[in-house]
């Protein structure tokens, strides 16, 4: 009898201890829940997640606990906010298993399934919601939106991968993203479109978002590396590309990009060296190889187009030189060197007003640059020279004509255009032509006058004089040691202009 009393007392003590533990556990769960909610309101999600997890651990396998579903739902929300969608789905699956009629958990699960590209599963989930709550407007709206997203995705994949229509694709992708914000495929297509449009900052933003939730995303690491290289950050680019190869050693994109970077650097260095060696055609070949890799990078492409401009002018291709400078200025409209060298190309093409305009624009960015000031002076002088009578053109001879060739040309033209051979109606015009022929001959037959004329002096202007440096226009070297080149004739009467590079 005494033994039975002892057992009874022991059982009572155990029951009391258990009740006390349950009360303590309940209080602790409530405290973890309350503290977790407070931390969420302060934006401290990691700490909140710890509190929710502690509460869930205390509940254990008691799926009927009144806070069980709520805690799982809240922790799933944090996982989703952190981009940890698989963990979020795991918690939501447990919550729905405990309470199949929980609409909020089902809507959240459908949203995450959509973000993972599991559209069919998401549609089924929304349909289950409608079976529970036929009037649920959110489920109805999302079903229609997902149908549209599926159509848009099919269309935009073709636009990006086949048509290469990056500009128009961006609007569609952003529209899709407004419905399924975390869909990785959409973010990666946006990376490609933003990169091709030159919006490097947005590429970095998209890749950062992907890597926060999936640090091993090789595709995101590839686009991040490719973008940093285009921004001129080679070392950072190589770091991300090599990191991608750690996760996938056989990844063709990362391997190809590393090879491309090395090829680009080699072509760029070769182009510069060949230019310095005055091997301009060979330099142009290397420039084209480099531009094929990086045609639109403000950092890499601008100096290449500038070097191309100089090479083309060296081989007397003025119009193509202007086009190359135009491309440099499209990438960097404030580039004073590009403006200066385009002005030099305009000088070669005898478009002195455009040359003067570019020199003046360059001066706005570099007001104290002596080369730019000299360019302005040369363009103004060339404009003055262009207004003079072109004696060489009048006689139909080259600037290099000998005295004998000058005399021969004069005699031939004088006989052909003598006023006595003209009719009365054309006599006045014929006399003017004859006078011009005589004036040209008088200027060019005299060695001293011819020299003064070739130097840019108006020999018929009694107040003319030298007026500065004349047509020789200096001879200083340009940027990176590039020297001006000589002897390009500016029409019949131009004086052997020198062009200067920066």
UniProtKB/Swiss-Prot annotation:
Origin superkingdom: Eukaryota
UniProt xrefs under Pfam families: DnaJ (PF00226), TPR_1 (PF00515), TPR_19 (PF14559), TPR_8 (PF13181)
GO biological process assignments: protein folding in endoplasmic reticulum; response to unfolded protein
TPR repeats: 29-62, 69-102, 103-136, 184-217, 218-251, 264-297, 302-335, 336-369
InterPro entries on file: DnaJ_domain (IPR001623), DnaJ_domain_CS (IPR018253), J_dom_sf (IPR036869), TPR-like_helical_dom_sf (IPR011990), TPR_rpt (IPR019734)
Molecular function terms from GO: misfolded protein binding; protein-folding chaperone binding
Presence of keyword Disulfide bond: yes
Signal peptide segment: 1-25
Glycosylation sites: 51
A GO term from the CC aspect: endoplasmic reticulum
Function, in words: May be involved in the unfolded protein response (UPR) during ER stress.
This protein's name: DnaJ homolog subfamily C member 3 homolog
UniProt organism field: Dictyostelium discoideum
